[in-house]
Amino acid sequence: MGIAGTDPVLAPVDVLVRTFNSATTLSACLAAAKRHLPVRRIIVVDRNSTDDTAEIARAFGAELHFEEAGIGRATTLAARLAETENVLYLDSDVILRSASFYSDAVRALALPRTGAVVGIAIGHRFRFGLPLGLTLLRRAWVLSIDIPDDAQGAETYFLRRALKREHRRVRYVSGAMDHLGTYRGKGWAEWQGAQLRLAAGWSISTIIDSFLVILLIHANSRSPRNVLYTPIFFLHLLRGFTDPSRWRMRDRRTVSLAYGRRGQTATSREPPVCEGGGSEERLIP
């Protein structure tokens, strides 16, 4: 359910999409955004995709920009290019379903001590973290945060750290979207662990938070197999966390496999766990 209240007159919003090789899902993503949002501009920051991502973005009238530094660079660049007071980060594998999400999110962001509003996937019971799959933020605040350009899988750590420092909270809107998900290849957990270590340093609390996030991600999948796999996945993540020099240099694109439908069996031994690129499903807490 959304946040109760009378819908305000909603100002148009710049929609920010960071992506790579998302031709399979991008059309549905952008079509849903245009259907349910008062879009002012769609700004796509692409990591030089090798499929039809760029052509699809242009067909929807999106402004297309390219980067090779990392998702941290894409996150900041998109906000710099935007002009609206609030910006909506949208992942290319997220399909917005709720016509009321944006009005709910605008009202929530206006509440005291609120720094971000996250849309939750349909059917997901557990809320956590600060992914950027469907997330409304104040543009000026995003630009005030120093996110390293080469941040790969832990760029939101810097946003979460700022919220904690400012004593602001994340609010959530349930039943907002479907996350089609991206299945990850061998070494994905280790790579995530390495990126977390590089962002947060050696921190016991960060390790504990990581385990809890993984557990909640798997619980949201409602798959006993995924839940039982949690300790094994966490051990893989710890391997990357404790030896970041070995795992950090892998290009993010080499550990990303093909897009697929929810519930489809993953091609690797690991269960189908989404990066957050989409909903609240992010391995980095």
Regions found by a protein language model. Give the residues of each.
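Short, acidic, metal-binding catalytic loop of nucleotide-sugar glycosyltransferases
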Residues: A31-R40
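Acidic helix N-cap motif at the loop->helix transition within catalytic regions
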Residues: T24-S27, D51-A59
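Non-catalytic, C-terminal membrane-associated alpha-helical segments of glycosyltransferases
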Residues: R184-P285
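A conserved acidic beta->alpha catalytic loop
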Residues: D46-A54, I95
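Glycine-rich, basic loop-to-helix element that forms the pyrophosphate-binding segment
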Residues: F66-A82, G129
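Acidic donor-binding loop at a coil-to-helix junction in glycosyltransferase catalytic cores
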Residues: Q152-R161
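Short aromatic/hydrophobic "clamp" motif used to bind/position activated sugar donors
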Residues: V87
